[in-house]
């Protein structure tokens, strides 16, 4: 990688990692994405989340390309490592292969982003086509959702943002919910009367 040899398992350690692939260095959408990732690095760092990029280009290419990324967004620094996977073995193992995009060497990485948890398991994946850049605000929101869910035995509803109500997980009984959420919770009165949609604040 651009930071020396990295073993993904060791890099994750006991924290969260955003592992993201890009189809190629010196390409337009990827340049804007990695610049955006650099701009958001402090947001992820505040949440205890590390970043790790990967593509099939070699380390020297990554290092040269980094100059373009930083020039495109003045003030942004690419402080996270970018891994080189020239034989494409890692992207295949990580299910980051684009079925349609190829070069002379074979299939290229897709625009995939995995959020990996402390247990080394993928908690969430985004898959974008090569023509569509990622939305970093949504990546931050997804990280906040995962961290909140892991800490409080809750789930987050559609369009949720930090500070808004969350829903209590279906596996938590009302009795257990009273202990877990002494601040109380609201059960929505729906036609089915099943009492499954319970909102609370955490």
Curated annotation (Swiss-Prot):
Expression across tissues: Embryos.
GO cellular component, one term: cytosol
Gene Ontology molecular function: thioredoxin-dependent peroxiredoxin activity
Kinase found in the keyword field: no
InterPro entries: AhpC/TSA (IPR000866), Peroxiredoxin_AhpC-typ (IPR024706), Peroxiredoxin_C (IPR019479), PRX_1cys (IPR045020), Thioredoxin-like_sf (IPR036249), Thioredoxin_domain (IPR013766)
Catalytic activity from the UniProt record: a hydroperoxide + [thioredoxin]-dithiol = an alcohol + [thioredoxin]-disulfide + H2O
Active-site residue list: 30 (cysteine sulfenic acid (-soh) intermediate)
Pfam family name, one: AhpC-TSA
Thioredoxin domain segment(s): 1-148
Presence of the UniProt keyword Transit peptide in the record: no
Localization per Swiss-Prot or TrEMBL: Nucleus; Cytoplasm
EC number: 1.11.1.24
Record motif Bipartite nuclear localization signal, residues: 178-201
Family: Belongs to the peroxiredoxin family. Prx6 subfamily.
Note: The active site is a conserved redox-active cysteine residue, the peroxidatic cysteine (C(P)), which makes the nucleophilic attack on the peroxide substrate. The peroxide oxidizes the C(P)-SH to cysteine sulfenic acid (C(P)-SOH), which then reacts with another cysteine residue, the resolving cysteine (C(R)), to form a disulfide bridge. The disulfide is subsequently reduced by an appropriate electron donor to complete the catalytic cycle. In this 1-Cys peroxiredoxin, no C(R) is present and C(P) instead forms a disulfide with a cysteine from another protein or with a small thiol molecule.
Record's function text: Thiol-specific peroxidase that catalyzes the reduction of hydrogen peroxide and organic hydroperoxides to water and alcohols, respectively. Seems to contribute to the inhibition of germination during stress.
Protein name, UniProt field: Probable 1-Cys peroxiredoxin
Organism of this sequence: Bromus secalinus (Rye brome)
């Amino acid at each position: 990688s651009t930071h020396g040899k990295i073993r993904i398992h060791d890099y994750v350690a006991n924290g969260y990692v955003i592992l993201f692939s890009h189809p190629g260095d010196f390409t337009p959408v990827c340049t804007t994405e990695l610049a955006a990732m650099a701009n958001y690095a402090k947001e992820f760092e505040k949440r205890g989340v590390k970043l790790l990029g990967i593509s099939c280009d070699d380390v020297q290419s990554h290092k040269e390309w980094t100059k373009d990324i930083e020039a495109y967004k003045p003030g942004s620094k690419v402080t996270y490592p970018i891994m080189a996977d020239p034989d494409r073995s890692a992207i295949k193992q990580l299910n980051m292969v684009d079925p349609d995009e190829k070069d002379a060497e074979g299939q290229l990485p897709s625009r995939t982003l995995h959020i990996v948890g402390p247990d080394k398991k993928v908690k969430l994946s985004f898959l974008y086509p090569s023509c569509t850049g990622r939305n970093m605000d949504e990546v931050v929101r997804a990280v906040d959702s995962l961290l909140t869910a892991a800490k409080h035995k809750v789930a987050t509803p559609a369009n949720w943002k930090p500070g808004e109500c969350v829903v209590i997980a279906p596996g938590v009984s009302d009795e257990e919910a009273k202990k877990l959420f002494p601040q109380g919770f609201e059960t929505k009165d729906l036609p089915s009367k099943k009492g499954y949609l319970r909102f609370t604040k955490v």
